[in-house]
Structure formats: C-alpha cells, structure tokens
C-alpha cells in the first residue's frame, strides 16, 4: 500500500469562518483531519491587568469588550462579583431589569450564532433574517443605554439609570414577533437535507469528554449534560422564573443547534415573566459610599456634585478577601475571580471566559472529520475572540 504524507495547512488568522483572528494549524491525511492546533492571542488587550489600575466602576466598560456580542452578560458577572465582595443587596426592580437585559443579550448573541453558522454552511437566507431580527434588540439596547454594543449599563449596586418610558411596550412588541421567526429558521434548516448532512454526526463529543474539557453552555448541554447556572446556581432572582433547560442526545452539531433554538424560545418566556413582575422602585442600592447619586442631585446641588466626583475619581474601598462569581452567559459559564487588598482597585482579577475553555475541545471534535466540515465545528462552538484573548 502506498504511503501517505501528512499535509499541514494554516487556517486563519484571517479567515471568514474563524469568526475573528484565530489561527488553526490543521494536519491532514488527504481530506481527513488528523490534528487541529488553535493559536490565539492576536486580539489580546490585557483586560485583566488593566483592571488592576482602575477603580471597580472604571473596570465595567472593559468587560463590555470581552464577548462584544453579549456586553450586558459580561457586565452582569462582574458587578455581581463586586457586590458579593461588598456584601450589598440590589433592589428588586434592578434585578428584574438585569434579567430582562441578560436574556435579550442571549437572544442577540444566539441570533448572530445561527446567522453565521448557517452562512458558513451555505444557508444565506437565515443569515439575512437573523440579522434583521437582531437589529430590533439593538434598538432596545440603544433605548436603555444609548449604545448599541458597548452598553456600560449595569453598575455596582444596580443600574446606571432606570428604563425609559415605552421600554416594556417596545420589548413586548419585539417578543411577539420571535415565535414566528424561530419557526421560519426551523423551517429553513431543520429538515433541509444539506443542513442535516453537514451537522448530524459532525463534531461529536461525549458527555464525559465535554465535562473533562470543562465545556459549558449550549455546547455542554448539546452533549446531554443537564447543567445551567441560572437554574442550578441561581443569581439575580432566576430561581423565580419558570423555564426549561434543553439538552441534546447525540452530542453532535445538530443537537447543539437544536439546544440553542429551544434556548431562544425559553429566553422569550423568561423575559415575559420578568416584564409581568416588574414593579416601581429604586434601581440603585442605598449605599452612598458605593453608588453614584441620582443625576438630578448632581445637577442641582453642590453636595450631589461632590458626592459624584468623589466616587468617580477615588472609587470605593472593598473588604480584603476573594470571591468567585459566575453567570450563564450565552456561550457558557463566564466567571470572575476577584482578589481585594482593601483598596479602591482590584488586586487581581481573573476572568474565566467560556469561549477560551470551549475552544480547547476543537481537536477532539474535529479529528477524523473532513476538512470541509471544520467550519461547522467552529460554528457550533460559537466562539468569540474578544473573550478568548481578553
């Protein structure tokens, strides 16, 4: 039998299907993948180190730039960690609004995932539809925070401001359209022969291997592991909401696709419950040493102006200690480990980004597949390089 020679090719760091500046060194035997080695770091900005030289409030805008497709989920994990360190409680209204925005963020992120994943495999129509729907959520983002992507909306102790008039009506109007849109996506993909051929049996990783690799989020649930932090380690009042956690059976790309579709429907359900439970009240904790004063106080009294200036310039001190806080971000478990030395700045902040951990499983998932199927494996992991490189 004739011997074969292993061919090594570079995929990226500038390749449309890698969803960012990711370089993959792929070893091939013909068209069969023998090994995939990811090379990262092209988007490294030193966010963890930068946080050591900024006050706790000044670090919030840095978290926007981790998974830039899900900025409010990044904000949420960070402010929860600082609040745990301080031992303060957040008003009920602020918690409900946080849940609403976190689930809208999940919808927004999953819409980008299904759009790009479908486009990678050749389904362009879904790409156009999903980005059209995402635009409606971006409008809500702009309504509440003034920004479409880097929102900087959450604060230690609550929110930067209350939701504007007309917010709940705008959200309900958008939610009413989603069930029909999800049906459209399923109609275009779920029984599409080409889609089934490219996803069923592709990127298989067993539940045991997924746990060993530390995979979280839809990629873990697609392997049949019933684990979701919102239900199993709840935060921000998630224990009050009724929702289902979907899990897969066959541990492949198609199952991960089905899991995310169901997750989007469940997010709509959670947001509706949150809107129904929204009551009047403050959106910032009554902690003058930590939280910014109301804007009307800043504009109309010298005391309010001095109060604002002091917190903005000096920050607030935290007790010595360390905490770890994780949230169920759209891509998996996003964790913040904070170490405080009692000053106004973190002594150390370590971020556990889900994409960074999930990416390491790509060799296991792609080995033995055709080179043409590698783009489907990348898409099913739903990585973003902003949080991988940090």
Swiss-Prot record:
PANTHER family noted in UniProt? NADH DEHYDROGENASE [UBIQUINONE] IRON-SULFUR PROTEIN 2, MITOCHONDRIAL (PTHR11993:SF10), NADH-UBIQUINONE OXIDOREDUCTASE 49 KDA SUBUNIT (PTHR11993)
Q: Which reaction does it catalyse?
A: a quinone + NADH + 5 H(+)(in) = a quinol + NAD(+) + 4 H(+)(out)
> InterPro entries recorded for this chain?
NADH_Q_OxRdtase_suD, NADH_UbQ_OxRdtase_49kDa_CS, NDH1_su_D/H, NiFe-Hase_large
Q: Which NCBIfam families match?
A: NuoD, PRK06075.1
> Which species does this protein come from?
Geotalea uraniireducens (strain Rf4)
Recorded family membership: Belongs to the complex I 49 kDa subunit family.
Q: How does it sit in the membrane?
A: Peripheral membrane protein
Recorded hits in HAMAP family, A to Z, give: NDH1_NuoD
Q: What is its EC number?
A: 7.1.1.-
Q: Which GO terms describe its molecular function?
A: NAD binding; NADH:ubiquinone reductase (non-electrogenic) activity; quinone binding
* Gene designation per UniProt: nuoD
**Domain of life of the organism in this record?**
Bacteria
Q: Which UniProt keywords apply?
A: Cell inner membrane, Cell membrane, Membrane, NAD, Quinone, Translocase, Transport, Ubiquinone
Protein name as it appears in the record: NADH-quinone oxidoreductase subunit D
This protein's GO CC annotations = plasma membrane
Say what the protein does: NDH-1 shuttles electrons from NADH, via FMN and iron-sulfur (Fe-S) centers, to quinones in the respiratory chain. The immediate electron acceptor for the enzyme in this species is believed to be ubiquinone. Couples the redox reaction to proton translocation (for every two electrons transferred, four hydrogen ions are translocated across the cytoplasmic membrane), and thus conserves the redox energy in a proton gradient.
Q: How does it assemble?
A: NDH-1 is composed of 14 different subunits. Subunits NuoB, C, D, E, F, and G constitute the peripheral sector of the complex.
Its localization reads:
Cell inner membrane
């Amino acid at each position: 039998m004739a011997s074969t020679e292993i061919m090594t090719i570079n995929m990226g760091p500038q390749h449309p299907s890698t969803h960012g500046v990711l370089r993959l060194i792929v070893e091939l035997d013909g068209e069969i993948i023998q090994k995939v080695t990811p090379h990262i770091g092209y988007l490294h900005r030193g966010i963890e180190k930068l946080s050591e030289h900024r006050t706790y409030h000044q670090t919030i805008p840095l978290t926007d730039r981790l998974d830039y497709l899900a900025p409010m989920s990044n904000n949420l994990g960070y402010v929860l960690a600082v609040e745990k360190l301080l031992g303060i409680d957040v008003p009920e209204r602020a918690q409900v609004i946080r849940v609403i925005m976190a689930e809208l963020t999940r919808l927004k992120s999953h819409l980008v995932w299904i759009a790009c994943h479908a486009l990678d495999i050749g389904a362009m129509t879904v790409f156009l539809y999903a980005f059209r729907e995402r635009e409606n959520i971006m409008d809500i983002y702009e309504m509440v925070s003034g920004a479409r992507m880097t929102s900087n909306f959450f604060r230690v102790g609550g929110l930067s401001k209350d939701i504007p008039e007309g917010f709940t009506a705008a959200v309900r109007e958008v939610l009413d359209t989603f069930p029909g849109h999800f049906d459209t996506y399923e109609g275009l993909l779920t029984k599409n022969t080409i889609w089934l051929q490219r996803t069923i049996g592709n990127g298989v990783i067993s539940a045991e291997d997924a746990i060993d690799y530390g995979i979280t989020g839809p990629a873990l649930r697609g392997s049949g592991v019933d684990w979701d932090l919102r239900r199993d380690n709840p935060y921000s009042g998630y224990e009050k909401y009724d929702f289902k956690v979907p899990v897969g059976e066959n541990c492949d790309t198609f199952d991960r696709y089905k899991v995310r579709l169901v997750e989007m429907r469940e997010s709509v359900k959670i947001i509706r419950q949150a809107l129904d439970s929204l009551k009047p009240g403050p959106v910032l904790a009554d902690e003058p040493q930590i939280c910014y004063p109301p804007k009307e106080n800043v504009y109309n009294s010298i005391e309010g102006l001095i109060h604002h200036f002091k917190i903005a310039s000096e920050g607030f001190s935290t007790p010595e200690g360390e905490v770890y806080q994780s949230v169920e971000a759209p891509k998996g478990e996003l964790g913040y480990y904070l170490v405080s030395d009692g000053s106004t700045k973190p002594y150390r902040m370590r971020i556990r980004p889900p994409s960074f951990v999930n990416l390491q499983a790509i060799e296991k998932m792609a080995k033995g597949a055709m080179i043409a199927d590698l783009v489907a494996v990348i898409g099913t992991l739903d990585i973003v390089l902003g949080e991988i490189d940090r």
